[in-house]
A protein has these predicted regions:
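Short, solvent-exposed aromatic-acidic interface loops
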Residues: 66-74, 110-113, 173-174, 213-219
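Structured beta-strand-rich core segments of catalytic domains in phosphoester-bond hydrolases
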Residues: 13-103, 213
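Metal-dependent phosphoester-hydrolase catalytic domains
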Residues: 117, 121, 130-139, 147-234
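Active-site beta-strand/loop signature of hydrolases that rely on acidic residues for catalysis
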Residues: 2-27, 54, 93, 103-109, ...
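Hydrophobic, aromatic-enriched interface-forming segments
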Residues: 109-113, 117-122, 126
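Residues that flank catalytic or metal-binding motifs in active/ligand-binding sites
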Residues: 32, 48-50, 87-91, 102, ...
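Extracellular/periplasmic catalytic domains that process cell-envelope and extracellular macromolecules
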Residues: 7-8, 29, 44-47, 83-87, ...
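Short histidine/acidic/glycine/proline-rich micro-motifs that form metal-
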Residues: 41-45, 112-114, 146-147
Length: 234
């Protein structure tokens, strides 16, 4: 019933991580109102996990899109970066709102779960790319950063001393709903020890209206090892 939850919350833009090609094809069939950008991280085609970025067809026109790898050679498909255990990448889209005519830049990523340098250097590269590609448009960045809010990685992303910094939507939202964590490993971690590692960041004038971590389960079943993060922006 995961597609029912997606329909219920009705997000205009949706960032997904760890999506395999067969799952992507299943989701395309079940979510016909969305188009998607992204490639498999292992070959830049359909091998390995996608950091797929979905957007509502009725709401947005796709102006441009692309992918890069979080590595010393970001344009080389399947490249591993620094001390990373896995190939890591980001997929992005420049979207035009059919209602307002405004343009938005959206990016979705998934940082390494092992490599400390890979996370730190990966977010530095990401900030550079967002600055380069967004063209001053309002920015929405979604992803599993495998790093807690107090970590050097997230502090680097949100460092106001860096003109390329992003703002954590949770920190500026007037409404914050749900737990202070997002990763529960299918309920195997005591809730008081669960970390917040999934984020929505904004930049360039976006106002955050509400933020929530959707931690409900389907009976005793978890839909994922992470709880979705939902943010409303204006």
């Amino acid at each position: 019933n995961e597609n029912f939850k997606i329909h219920f919350y009705d997000a205009d833009i949706l960032g997904t991580q760890e999506v395999l090609h067969n799952q992507l094809e299943d989701l395309k069939q079940r979510l016909p109102e969305y188009d998607v950008v992204g490639v498999g991280r292992e070959d830049g085609k359909d091998k390995g996990e996608y950091s797929a970025l979905w957007y509502k067809k009725e709401r947005f026109v796709l102006l441009d899109s692309g992918n890069f790898w979080l590595s010393e050679t970001p344009e080389v498909a399947g490249s591993k970066g620094w001390d990373g255990a896995c190939e890591r990448m980001a997929s992005w889209a420049k979207l035009k709102d059919k209602v307002s005519g405004k343009e938005y830049f959206a990016l979705n990523t998934h940082l390494d779960h092992v490599g400390v340098a890979a996370r730190r250097e990966g977010v530095s590269l990401m900030l550079d790319k967002v600055n380069e590609l967004s063209g001053g448009a309002p920015v929405i960045v979604t992803g599993d950063f495998n790093a807690a809010p107090e970590s050097d990685v997230i502090r680097h992303v949100t460092d106001t001393g860096n003109p390329k910094h992003l703002t954590d939507a949770r920190e500026i939202s007037p409404i914050v709903y749900g737990p202070s964590w997002s990763f529960h490993n299918y309920g195997k971690i005591p809730y008081e020890e669960c970390p917040l590692i999934d984020y929505v960041f904004v930049r360039n004038g976006l106002k955050v209206l509400k933020y929530g971590v959707l931690a409900e389960t389907e009976g005793d079943a978890f839909l994922s090892d992470h709880a979705p993060v939902l943010v409303t922006v204006k």
